[in-house]
């Protein structure tokens, strides 16, 4: 027999961004609990609003499944003493199983007889198990927690009521001073308290009290209302998924409305208007069919349409105040030159242990020029890069960015253009922040990409130099994200730069020309390892997924060049299912293991054919020499193809040749031959890491 079960946790209003993660966590914890308790169940239906987290479990079994299992004990020779009596080992075993020696049987396993017992565990009724959900509720974790009254217990928000209803029966337990019941709360202003007769009444009963508990249903309603509004007014509305989810989790009874603002504010850059509407007020914005931003906003009220004119007027007043501030800052900022703003940066601290923003910009300018030349930027691009690096943080001291921090870079681009900077320079000022999120958009221009890498590397090296290295989940300055951004930009631009060389070159430049008492060389190895970890992170995010052993292999690429690593992984992944992949890798790894035994200088790898003692050596030598000239300019795909070609010759070579010959000259000659092949293989990484079956 099965019954529905409802669990609802009633809370004070939660922040919108934790509602969905919280209900997902609760669902997983409840599901795991039911499975651990051997309780069969049907569908789990979740409900979530700012004031409640709830789960309706359909077809919950009325008792645990009975468990019949067999337990293996000691070997028979240990279970019985010399007189055939039960030993202490046997008696202790059955006592631990809750049985007696009368329950023992013997079974043979791999030629040895062992003690076995069979035991049955009769399932408990579900009513006896469900009170343990108290521990599930209390074990939940949240990004921020609070305590209330005099309780030591902390939760996302104070708990005000709990429903635990098995069909029509309340399951009793308490958390702090809150005891389970069958009563829930309707909308804070429109609804009333409602008592449920049975669990399945939940959704309909709440809807009658102005609460749409189903998050998907609430979101669909908002979307439908806004789309209807847009159609009636011939608007285009960007229903941003993140904003839609946030608004959905701010309300229990959504009613969309629209208001207007003075068209004079359209003179302000639209990014400012959109930020004011979307990020600050949680409004959707609208465009004309021609794509022009319109002086209207769309909001969602947590309530019905009563007195909507007052709601609209209030929202218009709040937005107008924000836009008036923005208009003021926009015009006041233009009275200050870029040079004046840059001068102010000498008094703006980047970090008290590192120095000012002006000092950071000096370092970044040097790094950017070095990188720009390394990556082949044109003379004109290098000129733009120099100018961009001289000014790129100037907007941080403007009034607009002081009020709307999320517009840093965006306003820098706008103001730079207004003051006569070239489009390339202005764009780089904006792009140097990119990617803003881990998988966000990348700089589209080379100048912006170089400046972004230089700025991010400087930040990373600065904090490492003063010992502020990320550990565990502690990364207050987002250095992992910035390093990951470097890796993604290098990949996107196909720019080659070995990480160890990168660090050494940067340290030298800064030490010589912009020291500012920062020792970048102290943590050079740590920075290289940190970047390598971000390359691994990039691999983990790739689809189709790259095999872990392939990742391990290419991360040991001698040059530590991220772009080469990505290409090597692509090549190995393309061949991992080849019929000869196993044989090729086994042959090459044998070469690599012997090459590791080389104990002499390998800068001049010259093989002497006069020392060959068999035809297999000659055949391999001829094939390698034919390939050797091309491998320096080969692609990695061509290098792998060369290894495939050499594979049968390598196998024949090992069949006929003792590499570690007693004669030193012969041994060195053979190891040199293998070192040449090893160098081709090492261009792909350390193939010893590959697992082939």
Curated annotation (Swiss-Prot):
EC numbers on record: 6.1.1.14
NCBIfam families: glyS (TIGR00211)
Enzyme class: ligase
Compartment annotation: Cytoplasm
Molecular-function GO terms, alphabetical: arginine-tRNA ligase activity; ATP binding; glycine-tRNA ligase activity
GO biological process, one term: glycyl-tRNA aminoacylation
Major subcellular location class: cytoplasm
Similarity section: Belongs to the class-II aminoacyl-tRNA synthetase family.
Complex formation: Tetramer of two alpha and two beta subunits.
Name the record gives this protein: Glycine--tRNA ligase beta subunit
Organism for this UniProt entry: Latilactobacillus sakei subsp. sakei (strain 23K)
PANTHER family: GLYCINE--TRNA LIGASE, CHLOROPLASTIC_MITOCHONDRIAL 2, GLYCYL-TRNA SYNTHETASE
GO CC, one annotated term: cytosol
Keywords for this protein: Aminoacyl-tRNA synthetase, ATP-binding, Cytoplasm, Ligase, Nucleotide-binding, Protein biosynthesis
Signal peptide (UniProt feature, chain positions): none
Pfam families on file: DALR_1, tRNA_synt_2f
HAMAP family in alphabetical order: Gly_tRNA_synth_beta (MF_00255)
Substrates-to-products reaction catalysed: tRNA(Gly) + glycine + ATP = glycyl-tRNA(Gly) + AMP + diphosphate
């Amino acid at each position: 027999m099965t019954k529905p079960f409802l669990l609802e946790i009633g809370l004070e209003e939660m922040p919108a961004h934790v509602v969905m993660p919280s209900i997902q966590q609760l669902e997983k914890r409840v599901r795991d609990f039911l499975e651990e308790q051997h309780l069969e169940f049907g569908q789990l239906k979740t409900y979530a609003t700012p004031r409640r987290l709830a789960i309706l479990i359909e077809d919950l079994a009325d008792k645990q499944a009975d468990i019949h299992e067999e337990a293996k004990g000691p070997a028979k020779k240990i279970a019985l003493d010399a007189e055939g009596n039960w030993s202490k080992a046997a008696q202790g075993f059955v006592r631990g199983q809750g049985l007696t020696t009368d329950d023992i049987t013997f079974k043979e396993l791999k030629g040895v007889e062992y003690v076995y017992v069979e035991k049955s565990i009769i399932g408990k009724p579900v009513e006896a198990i469900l009170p343990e959900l108290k521990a599930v509720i209390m074990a939940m974790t949240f990004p921020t927690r609070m305590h209330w009254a005099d309780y030591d217990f902390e939760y996302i928000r104070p708990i005000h009521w709990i429903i635990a209803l098995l069909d029509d029966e309340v399951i009793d337990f308490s958390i702090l001073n809150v005891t389970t019941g069958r009563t829930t709360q309707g909308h804070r202003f429109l609804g009333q308290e409602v008592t449920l007769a049975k669990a399945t009444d939940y959704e309909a009963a709440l809807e009658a009290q102005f609460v749409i508990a189903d998050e998907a249903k609430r979101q669909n309603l908002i979307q439908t209302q806004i789309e209807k509004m847009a159609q009636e007014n011939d608007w285009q509305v960007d229903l941003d998924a993140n904003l839609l989810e946030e608004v959905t989790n701010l309300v229990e009874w959504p009613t969309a409305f629209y208001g207007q603002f003075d068209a004079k504010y359209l003179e302000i850059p639209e990014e400012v208007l959109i930020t004011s509407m979307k990020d600050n007020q949680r409004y959707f914005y609208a465009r004309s069919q021609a794509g022009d931003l319109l002086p209207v906003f769309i909001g969602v009220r947590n309530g019905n349409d009563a007195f909507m004119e007052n709601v609209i007027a209030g929202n218009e007043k709040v937005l107008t105040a924000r836009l008036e501030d923005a208009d003021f800052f926009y015009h006041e900022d233009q009275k200050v030159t870029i040079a004046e703003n840059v001068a102010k940066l000498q008094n703006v601290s980047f970090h008290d242990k590192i120095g000012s923003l002006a000092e950071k910009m000096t370092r970044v300018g040097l790094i950017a020029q070095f990188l720009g030349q390394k990556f082949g930027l044109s003379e004109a691009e290098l000129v733009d890069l120099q100018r961009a690096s001289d000014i790129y943080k100037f907007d941080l001291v403007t009034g607009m960015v002081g009020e709307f921090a999320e517009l840093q870079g965006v306003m820098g681009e706008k103001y730079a253009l207004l003051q006569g900077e070239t489009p390339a320079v202005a764009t780089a000022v904006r792009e140097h922040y990119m990617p803003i999120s881990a998988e966000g958009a990348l700089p589209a221009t080379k100048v912006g990409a170089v400046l972004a890498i230089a700025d991010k590397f400087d930040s990373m090296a600065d904090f490492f130099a003063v010992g502020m290295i990320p550990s565990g989940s502690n990364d207050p300055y987002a250095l992992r994200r910035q390093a990951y951004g470097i890796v993604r930009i290098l990949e996107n631009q196909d720019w080659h730069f070995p990480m160890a060389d990168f660090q050494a070159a940067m340290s030298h430049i800064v030490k010589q020309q912009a020291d500012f008492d920062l020792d970048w060389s102290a943590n050079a190895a740590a920075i290289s390892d940190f970047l390598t970890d971000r390359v691994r992170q990039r691999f983990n995010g790739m689809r189709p997924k790259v095999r872990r052993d392939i990742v391990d292999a290419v991360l040991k690429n001698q040059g530590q060049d991220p772009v080469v690593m990505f290409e090597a992984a692509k090549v190995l992944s393309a061949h991992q299912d080849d019929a000869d992949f196993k044989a090729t890798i086994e042959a090459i790894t044998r070469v690599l293991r012997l090459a590791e035994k080389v104990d002499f200088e390998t800068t001049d790898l010259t093989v002497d054919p006069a020392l060959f003692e068999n035809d297999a050596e000659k055949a391999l030598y001829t094939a390698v020499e034919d390939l050797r000239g091309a491998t320096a300019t080969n692609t990695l795909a061509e290098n792998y193809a060369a290894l495939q070609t050499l594979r049968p010759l390598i196998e024949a070579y090992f069949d006929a040749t003792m590499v570690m010959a007693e004669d030193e000259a012969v041994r060195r000659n053979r190891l040199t031959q293998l070192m040449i092949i090893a160098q081709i293989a090492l261009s792909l990484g350390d193939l010893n890491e590959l697992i082939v079956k």
